[in-house]
Amino acid sequence: MKKVIFSGIQPSGQLTLGNYIGALKQFGQFQDEYECFYCIVDEHAITVPQDRLKLREQTRSLAALYLAVGLDPEKATLFIQSEVAAHAQAAWILQCNVYIGELERMTQFKDKSDGKAGVSAGLLTYPPLMAADILLYQTDLVPVGEDQKQHIELTRDLAERFNKKHADIFTMPEVFIPKQGARVMSLQDPTKKMSKSDANLKNAIFLLDPPATIRKKIKSAVTDSSGIIEYNKEEKPGVSNLLTIYSVITGETISTIEEKYVGKGYGDFKTDLAELVVAELEPIQERYYAYLKSEELDTILDAGAEKAARVANKTLKKMENGVGLGRKRRR
């Protein structure tokens, strides 16, 4: 029996080359080896103000992009969080089993609420909803970044508490660190991670950037004055970042790439890298726009929501029985 992976992503901001290299590029491998549930977590998105039309547009866009990068709906389940009611229902049950002090200690809540007036209660209760997302599918593995590891720890605490107090229902999820965890950094500040929410658009290559924009961004990427193409994260973070991108896209080792560019300058290297990135992303963009215009996208999302609901509702019924909600029925 395959282990279960659950992965959720908010439909806010455009996905970057960093998202692709760090996670999306591995979809093909994951869906062959695991039972995968990929959820577009639009309910999480509304913990902060959203434009309703833009949110719906970004939700559909993200689904199309997931399919374009290689998610196979015959092998993995792709769905929208708000279209499976069990998520909100399970979140309420878990919310009644978590303590306010635990929620207030979450680093992400502190960061997002610090110095802000009118912070929504949803931002505070974000972790129980995330826990519901994960636990409903009897998830074994959760691929997350460093910023979410604390939430997974709380999810495990909630699962253990619920299992002991009510019924032994939940699988204990583990943080999943993919084998190939290439970390792509900002083009203008290679000491920080490339981010889809970065205000400076020059810092990131977005998956839907046109070729001319990609070439311009890579050409202007920060390097150094030595002109020598070699990997040294401490002394040459900019060049090292570009070498990482080159290596992941081509499959060549860093040392092979370094040898290839001995005696050549940054100009040649950046030009070649830009063409590699363009060639990698062009077919993804073609598939993306085809899905976006097609009714097939909605058919896939409908089927995904139905499958997800069947799995989630089984766990939800056990949760409701465990705490005594509703009438006890034989069926």
Swiss-Prot record:
Reaction(s) catalysed (UniProt annotation): tRNA(Trp) + L-tryptophan + ATP = L-tryptophyl-tRNA(Trp) + AMP + diphosphate + H(+)
Keywords: Aminoacyl-tRNA synthetase, ATP-binding, Cytoplasm, Ligase, Nucleotide-binding, Protein biosynthesis
Motif 'KMSKS' region: chain residues: 193-197
SUPFAM superfamilies for the chain: Nucleotidylyl transferase (SSF52374)
Keyword set includes Cytoplasm: yes
Location (main, coarse): cytoplasm
Location in the cell: Cytoplasm
One Gene Ontology term, aspect cellular component: cytosol
Top-level taxonomic group: Bacteria
EC number(s) reported in the record: 6.1.1.2
Positions with a binding annotation for ATP: 10-12, 18-19, 145-147, 184, 193-197
Annotated family: Belongs to the class-I aminoacyl-tRNA synthetase family.
PANTHER family hit by this protein: TRYPTOPHAN--TRNA LIGASE, MITOCHONDRIAL
Stated name of the protein: Tryptophan--tRNA ligase
